[in-house]
Amino acid sequence: MPNYKEKIAEFENNFSTVIDKSVRDLSMAFDNLYLDKNAKEIPPTIKLAEALLSGEHNISTKMQIHYDIANAYHDLRMIEGVYSERYLEKELYHLRCALDMYETNYYDADSNSAEVKVAQYIAMRSYTNLGNAYRALDRYIVAIDCFQDALLISDDFAMASLNLSFLLFRYAPLQIKRYEQSYYHHACYYYYKQTERCKINLE
């Protein structure tokens, strides 16, 4: 069984093989804009990303573009520090676009190909981010479903189990009946331990 470093090397090789270089460069540009808290340049970079969607890219690459655009709208919300329904709606829309592509083309795929593996990884991150977006709207049940959808792809995806554990911790006290509170507290602990077991996979 490959160790963590071998898994990372395999993923990086798969990602660079499957995802077009122009899209990989754009992903890095978005990351740098967020690190620099450069909100002014994010909207024009989103327009560049949207223009790439009309290109003849493979499905995984288009999933990555939608994922990056969704993250950019999330980053705008975080940098500006204000609740923006407009940004949140666009974030939800692009995450859903990425996941629609995954569910239509790869959901039942049993292939071990590089493209399927990359699509699964983008889908896990998209489900997790979608769960966090719904959590921001206090739509806890839908958010729980999103985190669990990510874990159905791989229960080693620690970002999903970590966020699910945190959400269940917040959701448990909202229950009226004691046994319901206990149920969600136990579920919270279960996913916390799962995160601990897979913490090497945290990003």
Question: PLM features: residue spans?
Answer:
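Residue signature of alpha-solenoid helical repeat architecture, marking inter-repeat boundaries
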Residues: 19-20, 60, 64-67, 114, ...
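Conserved alpha-helical positions within TPR/SEL1-like repeat arrays
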Residues: 31-34, 64-75, 121-136, 159-170
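Residue-level detector of the short coil/turn that links helix A to helix B
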Residues: 37-40, 77, 138
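Single-residue signature of alpha-solenoid repeat helices
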Residues: 45, 91, 143, 180-182, ...
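Alpha-solenoid helical repeat scaffolds
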Residues: 47-50, 89, 96, 103, ...
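Conserved structural position within tetratricopeptide repeats
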Residues: 51-54, 100, 107, 151-152, ...
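Residue-level recognition of tetratricopeptide repeat
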Residues: 62, 105, 123, 157, ...
